[in-house]
Amino acid sequence: MSAILSADDLNDFISPGVACIKPVETLPAKDPSKTDNPYEVTTEDKVQPENLPPAQISLTDCLACSGCVTSAEAVLISLQSHAEVLNTLDAHPELPLNREDGTITQELGTASDEGRVFVASVSPQVRASLAATYGITEKEATYMIHQFLSGPHGLRAGGKNGSGFTWVADTNVLREAVLVLTADEVGETLTTSPDSPSTNGATNTLPKRPILSSACPGWICYAEKTHPFVLPHLSRLKSPQALAGTFFKTVLSKSLGIPASRIWHLAVMPCFDKKLEASREELTDASWLSAKDEDHTAVRDVDCVITTREMLSLASSRGISLPNLPLKSLPQSYIPPFPDMTLNDFLFSKSSPGQSAAAGTSGGYLHHVLQTFQARNPGSEIVTQRGRNADVVEYTLMSSEHTPILKAARYYGFRNIQNLVRKLKPARASRLPGGNRRLPVGRGAASGSSGTDYAYVEVMACPGGCTNGGGQIRIEDAREASSSVQSSTSAEVPDSSSKPTPHEQRAWLARVDEAYYSAESDTESEAGSQSQPLSILDKEDKIHNAMRYWSDSMGIPLSKLAYTTYREVESDVGKSQPAATDTTRVAELAGKIGGGW
């Protein structure tokens, strides 16, 4: 490449468009003295606009927009941000809970209608970003978050009501459940026909092969708007964020005897697109409530999503210095027991699973599928083949007789997703009588394996995976944060006044990845001092038992708790026009047949 066009400058980031696809225009008011005459001829500058109500752009408009995903994020920042967290904490006091059994200690009457139970779920990528920023371990970053959200020196130290978060969960636990159910889903598609109903009791059929992962909301939003033909291939499982929301809302609602609207769930994620996911109408209590009132307003399973950078803004707004918080676990006096002790042991297990480098930084969906089928086929081995770039990798599980058992792949970044979509695009029917159907033509279709050869594909919108999410702490923010903290690692961070070079940005992402993978060694050291780690098949039994207990205790089928649906999204821009008059229809017809007035 030339010095001007360098591979270091390639990036999938799309800056938000300067013009909205549905702009709000200010037009002069119509003269009420004039009446409409469909046959009146006038000049363009004399046309009076209708007196319409003020235009509003809602989240629904953004979800139905045919523009890029990033344009919607700018609107969502104002709808789900650290300011909303502060406003909610100030508007609603915490419901007092018994520190012995986790039950509500006051009568639920008119006086306490404003009370809320605040819960939070935090992704491991967020902890890795904080650990790299402040030069601490992943475990210490976990302590920092808990002290900030629930401790006496964090959010509870200020605000109108001194409210904080009663329970803070690690999404790794729910991710483990999704991984096990994903392997089950892949196994079902390998042994049954595509149109067969799922054995989990879901009313919908199994996804088509290859199954495409559905945990990345940027990828899902893109598929629903642009390539609806891939929707039958999407995994029906909820993401760990969505599953955590359903888990909290169902268990606490039934155990505490309060409606889901009085449980406020915050998710801290590495990605702005998680705000889009939380706003989906499929991820509300309407999807799992057995008996719904006609006047019932759907309540989100995840009420608000903030990113890692927004958590820094949240702390700054309250005047809290995150690195000055105690880097140790909270005393049990600040954490009441979860109402259901069986689910408490599941959700707050002492050794939450970490991630190995082989699993990647996006949850390890593909890695778990391969490991599961390898455990079910003793003597088999995994053969890895790198694709056109580092974000495309193909895997083949070979039996002891060197015959392929399963093929899978990993596609990160929209550049590579385009190639995957081309492989899955249905063949075009020939317009000539008796002609053969024509396969799609493209670079992605001409090279590599056919998309239908895969049993499972892990798809993520961000190049490099979720540790490189758009909401993560950037190197510029890390420089500013570390410059105010006197630590032994402050010398490793370059001068905050200089613009980071591509090499420095890659080095920063490597530090975040290192912190992310370090969680595995912490988990292993803890587990080694207590008991031997569970095998994959033992983990499957543990997860299946927990999911079965959750479903039975709630009286809700697992198909409603852990699975979701997708839909084709069409742009509604320009479609909400008033019904055309007879004159308009005649004019349109005349224009189509070449006539006129």
From Swiss-Prot:
UniProt binding sites for [4Fe-4S] cluster 1: C20, C62, C65, C68
Cite the Pfam families for this sequence. Answer: Fe_hyd_lg_C
Q: Where is this region: Disordered?
A: 428-449, 479-505
Gene Ontology terms describing biological process: iron-sulfur cluster assembly
- Source taxon at top rank: Eukaryota
Care to name a GO molecular-function term for this sequence? iron-sulfur cluster binding
Q: Does the keyword Nucleotidyltransferase apply?
A: no
Gene3D superfamilies in the record: 3.40.50.1780, Fe-only Hydrogenase (Larger Subunit), Chain L, domain 3
What keyword terms does UniProt attach to this protein?
4Fe-4S, Iron, Iron-sulfur, Metal-binding
Q: Where does [4Fe-4S] cluster 2 bind?
A: C216, C271, C462, C466
Q: What role does it play?
A: Component of the cytosolic Fe/S protein assembly machinery. Required for maturation of extramitochondrial Fe/S proteins. May play a role in the transfer of pre-assembled Fe/S clusters to target apoproteins.
Give the family per the record. Belongs to the NARF family.
Q: What is this protein called?
A: Cytosolic Fe-S cluster assembly factor nar1
- Identify the species of origin: Aspergillus niger (strain ATCC MYA-4892 / CBS 513.88 / FGSC A1513)
Q: What is the lineage of its organism?
A: Eukaryota, Fungi, Dikarya, Ascomycota, Pezizomycotina
Q: What gene is it encoded by?
A: nar1
